[in-house]
Amino acid sequence: KEDAVVYPPQLSREQCSSEQTARYKAELAKRLALETTDNVEVKETEILKDAENLKDIEGLKYIDVLSHSEFSTDVSSTLAVDLTGGFGVDFSFIAPLFDRAIYCERNPQLCTIARHNFRVLGLDNACVANSEAERLLQDMPPANLIFIDPARRDGHGGKTVAIADCTPDVSALRPLLVSKGRKVMIKLSPMLDWHKAVADMCGSVAEVHIVATGGECKELLLVADSDSHDSVSVTCVNDTERFSFTHTEGEQQPLPPLQDAGELFAASPATATSQHAEAPAPLYLYEPNASIMKAGCFGLLAVRYGLRALGRNSNLFVSNAMVNGFPGRQFAVTGCSTMNRQSLKALLADINSANVAVRNMPLSADALRKKLALKDGGDSYVFGTTAADGTHVILLCKRI
């Protein structure tokens, strides 16, 4: 249908953003656009020259030809360029925030689909360019924002993670990217180590955004520019939850004093191994969301919210007073036990089913569920973990 959105091949859909992550990138792009608008230094003659050159680049197949009117002589006019357009989900959310927007994609079929869809969506300020990203980047005019989402599959169709293995190689393009874009937003695999990604960009990264939805880490976003940054701002996002810090702040903050099994049972560690007890009242358990887990800022998280870690590698936290606004799941602990058979029997006497999870424990969740003879599901939550003193403990909880 002429008024219906057309969908691309399966491989292109695999790397598409969800609406929720696309909206977050649009929110970020809007802020970046405002930050760059007052710093436009491109002269009128340069804009016209670049616009004219852009129409005559050898080897480019433009579906929509850029005109002088699209490259306004108003130097306050804003431009966004998506160098790896794909299906155009991110572009369709970012483009309306700018006066002009260029969609670049090397696949001619996707360009045709994008051109149709942009018309359906009413994106009158969008231009579609069938080109390699590297070629357009070389000859395009300066932009307020460049967005790039390198393909994360190799020539054999296998998935890649490292920046250098993606197409195009953003680290190799870095000097040209930051010279042409006042701000550059780079979308990377959530599997990538964000510390290494920042290092690979040689000081150009100003911001890192770790984006999760529904408890699953979806995207790693870098914001780069031509400045050199010793301190990088890191924002962890999970749906409506936000947690921000500088990377030096996160690295320098160690875990506060840990919670050992003796404190959990209100007894000494020496006797805790044979005990089952009602948890000290009240006791609350906190599980960080996926973006926090990816960021690894556990010491800073504990300090900011006044929490204690159950163990050095448990990534679970406790407090005796409920904390509001914690970025993750919160539970009320109703009881706790060691792995002692009689203690477990007393703890789970009235529990037939539960949601079982393990953290830093030599058992899988399925193995622990089987050992405890529990069915999956229900309103109860069972966490198996290792306390600071090495004791394996089981916590029975209710979700708050």
Language-model features: where?
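SAM-dependent transferase fold signal centered on methyltransferase-like domains
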Residues: 1-400
